[in-house]
Amino acid sequence: MENEAITAYRQRRAAFEATFERHLAAGVVFYSADGILIDDTVEIAPGAVILPGTILRRETKIGAGSVIGPNSLLENVTVGENVKFNASQGYDSVIESGAAIGPFAHIRPDSRVCENVHIGDFVEIKNSTVGKGTSVSHLTYVGDSDVGKYCNFGCGVVTVNYDGAAKHRNTIGDYAFIGCNTNLVAPVSVGDGAYTAAGSTITDDVPAGALGIARARQVNKPQWAKGKLEKFIAKQQAKEEAGSK
């Protein structure tokens, strides 16, 4: 008598193969079935490309011309047309047409990534709207925020949305430029066309068209490192001499 686990696996496999064949016959492009799992409830438009290692769950919908994968997970996400979703995960969200996601991005629930947005590597979006044409290219957390269109986020931006008791929202206007390593301590707003200087921790609103700077002024101390450098060089020379003996 066959093991129950084996029977269950074969049933799941048969169901997947039927789903796979249905999408293939409808014009969805698969180069290989390796590592692909697709729930029967998923909708995929003809012309979409599903690459190996892709898992599509629940009520996910994929638009025509979109390329999903490799190694991606989408659960209850609506994806528009001509989206690129590479080596990333998304849950309970909307990704509009022309967006490019990944690699290694995380789209958490209740997010909307609008048309032609770029979400790059090691970016996390949570309960936020990212406006049309905005670029969030790398190493950034956007949580509980409303971001306008055609904004640019530098590397290392963090929306500081949790005070230990409650979550708060940030608002970033259209055409804003958020400098590298900016912390936006919610609730704050950055106005249309405003800039934040790299390395700033923004705790007050930045008006439209303004530059927000919130960082200590640099101080150089001449010759401060000279003694340390001399000791380090002497230590390295001693090691080299000992090793040559």
Where are these regions (language model features)?
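Thr-Gly-centered strand-to-loop micro-motif
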Residues: 32, 38-39, 51, 137, ...
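Acidic, glycine-rich loop-and-beta core segments that form the ion-binding/anion-interacting portion
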Residues: 38, 43-118
